[in-house]
C-alpha cells in the first residue's frame, strides 16, 4: 500500500498595511469574446465593464513582515453571472448520483462544502522585500473603496491571509480607517 499523502498545513495571519498610494481605473468595452471565433460561450454579454484599484503600502504588522512593501490589485469585475451572490448551499459537494455528501461527526451529519480557497493570491517577489497580490470582488466593493480613498486619511489595508502549503490566499481584504493590529 502506498503511503498516504500528507495534507498541506494551513496557517492564518492578519496583515496590517498603512496605505501610502493608490491608482484606479475604470474600463468599458465590447466583450472580447463576442468576436473571438476560437472561444465559444453559450451566451456571453456583449459589453464588459470593470473597475480596479491598486493599493500600495508598507506592512507594519506582524513584526516578522514589517517593512515589506505590498501592492494589491483589487478588481471589480463580475465574471460569472451571480458569482458573488452564491450561497453556501450552492457549494454543497455532491456524489456521482447528484446526492449531497455528509460526514458523520460524533453521530451528527455535517454537510461537506466546496468552499473557494480565497478572493485572490499573494506572492513574494523573489529577491526583494516586496509582495504582490490580486483579488476579485464585486464592482460595488471597489466603488466603495474609491469613495474612501481621496477623503479619508490615514487608511489601512487589512488582509486576512490563508497559507495552504506554499500558496498564500487572500481570505479577506478590507480598507479601513482604524489600525487592524489594534482591534
Regions found by a protein language model. Name each.
Residues 1, 155, 173-177:
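Aromatic-residue detector
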Residues 111-156, 160-167:
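Acidic, glycine-rich flexible loop segments
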Residues 22, 122-124, 178:
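Low-complexity, intrinsically disordered/propeptide-like segments
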Residues 82-132:
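Short acidic, glycine/tyrosine-flanked loop/strand segments centered on an H-E-D-like triad
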Residues 162-183:
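OB-fold/S1-family single-stranded nucleic acid-binding modules
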Residues 1-104:
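OB-fold ssDNA-binding interfaces and closely related basic DNA-contact patches used
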Residues 17, 46, 72, 101, ...:
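Weak global preference for isoleucine
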